[in-house]
Amino acid sequence: MKVGELNVSEKIKEILRERGIEELYPPQAEALTSGVLEGENLLVAIPTASGKTLIAEIAIANKLLEEGGKAVYIVPLKALAEEKFREFKDWERLGLKVAMATGDYDSKDEWLGKYDIIIATAEKFDSLLRHGSSWIRDVKMLVIDEIHLIGSRDRGATLEFIITQMLGRAQIIGLSATIGNPEELAEWLNAKLIRSDWRPVKLRKGVFYQGFVFWEDGGSERYNSWEELVYDAVKKGKGALVFVNMRRKAEKTALELAKKVKNYLDRKELRELRELAESLEENPTNEKLAKALLSGVAFHHAGLGRDERVLVEDNFRKGLIKVVVATPTLSAGINTPAFRVIIRDTWRYSEFGMERIPVLEVQQMMGRAGRPRYDEVGEAIIVSTTEEPSLVIDHYIKGKPEKLFSQLSNESILRSQILALIATFGYSEFKEIYDFLERTFYAHQGKDPYMLEEKIRRIIYFLLENEFIEVTLEDEIKPLPLGVRTTKLYIDPMTAKIFKDTLPRIEKNPNPLGIFHMISLAPDLTPLSYSKRETSMLEDEYYSLMDRLYFELDYENERKFFRAFKTALVLNAWINEVPEGEIVERFNVEPGDIYRIVETAEWLIYSLGEIAKVLEASQEVVDYVNTLRLRVKHGIREELIPLMELPMVGRKRARALYNAGFKDLESIRNAKPSELLRIEGIGAKIVEGIFKYLGKEVKITERPRKGTLDYFLNP
């Protein structure tokens, strides 16, 4: 179908043509003539890289230009939100303003009312629904990217609640990978179903086993090892993406592959890769990444910092990085296709031991093979060490993806959502709550209504017993202040209960380690894991620091206790300005883990302060908690807090300023620019920015530092 045949405004067609799109892919054409442009709900279940996003973009632009209002585009990851935000900016030329909303769950974000297209994570949009943001009534379209995540143990229930809230209020488009039961999902959504196996790049699939690749079509090719598949791709001037099941394995495999990949690079590439490697901040994980980068190889996992992940993704897309070894996090929607995808592991560790990776996930990884506009064919190869190729082909290549099942039985999320129905949406009777849940995917799948009823009763009793709600003499359910604040803070009521129960102990003995340990035991924070080798260190630390903790060692839940304790130790080191590299080495963690727990800890400590206010804790405790939140946010000791206001000043520069005698904003305002320039890490641009912030305009010509080549040439 030609773009000119689309039943949309000429302005939309013009944007598409400027992108070089003259003709739509068959699934796109089918979707856009299904009734979606006339307002019908739509579920698109097609392979990766088949143009799902463009279907949504055209439908959104058409809807908003014709009817006005707003569209919300839900994504599973912040990184994906940033990617979509960049893609959607094209539509601003038609007057459709685009915004992105991810963090800060305790805000109405009324500023979003000025925008037409809002890209948000599921959790962020759920929190906006709870806050009753006024602009939500103007939402005419809701797009759920990666809607198959409704079957995810962790996040599926949140997605299900959002959709249930919006069904009937807005047009809904679901974008999905190929799933096992799309008809059932489409029926629940009251949506037209577009299902297709069509791909813009042909995909050749096979299994590597005992020195041969056995292709799905019956052919075979000889390779000495699976690594030869990587080297062969690089020799052909193409890229390879290798999926493994563990972070450590990703790092080790990348460094092994790097030894040989380097031989296939030219001088220009080696020079650019050296510049990339030198741009990384120093820490043990980045040292390994830099070593691999020098040879055109990288690893990618959740333990990398955000900047490092973006650097790897961008340079792999550009073709400078030839090989990426990744954990499956990279298959979760980020746009990083490669000519050849090699799936090294089809088993992974879970809390229940080793488990087979689902067909849906493996097929998503395989879908990363083949780059539109660059490759005529992509190759996806599963490595098997023990299983016969025919069995792997039957299970993963020819097998159907698993069916999606509602995760509403996840009691933690159900607890939070039932409180939200009462405290935010005004549900005041058991029957109203039950009727709402009857509209969910859970109920649509015919799950046991008696079991659901029992869960609702148990949760309401928990909320009543812990003073989140009350039941009036007329049998009406009413929210209490603790319940209202808990749901607005977007925390699990169980977390709020832990805060409430622990506050008297905090009043008596306020200290960071105790608070960090408490929040790490709460369900809203996933604590760090620890190895057997670390057990004796953690036990020794515990016995020397136990007087600071609010919880005693519970031998029945020893592992949970020590995971929380290790997390508390890392946070304690962070606020005492221990360098990031030292934290990584001392506690056997990755930079990405530090950023994750710091971000979550800041939110939970803020929530603790808010719960303390509701429960009328002493002002001293509220102030103490708020100060601790700032220390966690910036990774600093208390005396540096005033300096963190300054632009371009992080924990290192703030400490350098303080140690040089500039302990507050007034002392900096009265300083000479030359005095600040003498401080390590403070350059002309930073000094200009600081003085501008303090209301003083200065212009500095930066002189070269002593001991540099520039100083030698221009003293």
Swiss-Prot record:
Keywords: ATP-binding, DNA damage, DNA repair, DNA-binding, Helicase, Hydrolase, Isomerase, Nucleotide-binding, RNA-binding. A motif (Q motif) lies at residues 1-29. It holds the Pfam family Helicase_dom4_arc. Residues 226-422 form the Helicase C-terminal domain. DNA-dependent ATPase and 3'-5' DNA helicase that may be involved in repair of stalled replication forks. Rapidly unwinds double-stranded (ds)DNA with a 3'-overhang, has no strand reannealing capabilities. Binds single-stranded (ss)DNA, dsDNA with a 3'-overhang and ssRNA. Belongs to the helicase family. Hel308 subfamily. Monomer. PANTHER family: ATP-DEPENDENT DNA HELICASE HEL308, DNA POLYMERASE THETA, PUTATIVE (AFU_ORTHOLOGUE AFUA_1G05260)-RELATED. NCBIfam families: PRK00254.1. This is ATP-dependent DNA helicase Hel308.
